[in-house]
Amino acid sequence: MSNPASKKADLRLALVECADDPDRLSRLLSDDSITDLDLRHALRGRLPAAVSAFVMEKSKFGTRQTVLGAIARSPSSAVRTALQALPGLSWRDLADVAVAAELAPAIRQKAEALLLDGITAMRLGDLITLSRIGPRRVASRLLLFADARVRAACLHNARLRDGDLCELLDHPETPREIASEILQVHRWATSYPVRRAIVRSPATPHPISLTLIAEMNPGDLRELAQSDNVPPLVSAVARRILG
């Protein structure tokens, strides 16, 4: 077992063979040569659910953050076991779990909720990374963050959709800078629904909204001209364009 890859494969096989025998599992996991990373790698593969439960509840590895991340991330873990592991995870593992489509919705949603709860305690660099790779709901929340670097990273999150930005632009706490930041990203700058939401948003500076309003289709111009929910200047310009 001197080859690292072979050692990890052998550990996974040994865990499978011991899955139904708690005494054998206990002896196996008491081996001091097994590292947290060895076990993390083994647990990420397909294993009987009993293995994850035993590791977390009855072994010395049950409080190790690295190992708990693998337990929560493994589709082989029972939902109850994965949920119990989540509070001990690093934010990176929580983000990984939250976007893993093969995991049960209850697990992904709990991981997402824990991320949202922990945002205020995270370092700026970690927030920037999370903004780029995190789940939609987390990225949407971080679009309201005061630091422009966090918002810029969010706008490059591939999981965001047009509707997320449209909802953001209608939010009462939307930063005034967000419209110009959105338009700097090609994906959003070429999205008609997003440009329309920018025009409608009270947070958008007039020079930006007035530049975009001429691109609106006739139906949207009529709606803008008649709406009481958009800035008065936007309505007035829409009426002028319509003649």
Residue spans for each PLM region:
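Alpha-helical scaffold segments
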Residues: 1-243
